[in-house]
């Protein structure tokens, strides 16, 4: 089953600001995750259905939400580790509920 990729508006703005090389790396990972987004090792602790993609060499992370009933993957935020984990709870509360 293939999932549909969506971006939260704020995450899309972050995406547009990324270096094209970083975008390309994330695109490669996102294509794989759209086939199978439920990767146990990438699950974010304390958040159901939230996962991450890490680009270790570049220091970036991307957090995404899997909505099973809609068969969708939502990119929530993109950034360096310290920034991402600070804004993630705020982004979830403002965008989702």
Give the label of every model feature segment.
Residues 21-33:
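Compact soluble domain cores
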Residues 17-22, 42-46:
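Short, mixed-charge, low-aromatic patches
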Residues 2-6, 10-13, 17, 24, ...:
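Enriched for short, Lys/Arg-rich terminal
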């Amino acid at each position: 089953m293939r999932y549909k990729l969506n971006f939260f508006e704020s995450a899309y703005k972050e995406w547009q600001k990324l270096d094209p090389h970083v975008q390309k790396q994330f695109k490669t990972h996102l294509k794989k995750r759209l086939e199978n987004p439920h990767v146990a090792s990438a699950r974010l602790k304390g958040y159901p259905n939230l996962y991450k993609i890490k680009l270790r060499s570049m220091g970036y992370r991307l957090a995404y939400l899997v909505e099973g009933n809609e068969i969708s993957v939502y990119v929530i935020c993109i950034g360096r580790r310290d920034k991402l984990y600070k804004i993630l709870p705020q982004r979830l509360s403002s965008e989702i509920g």
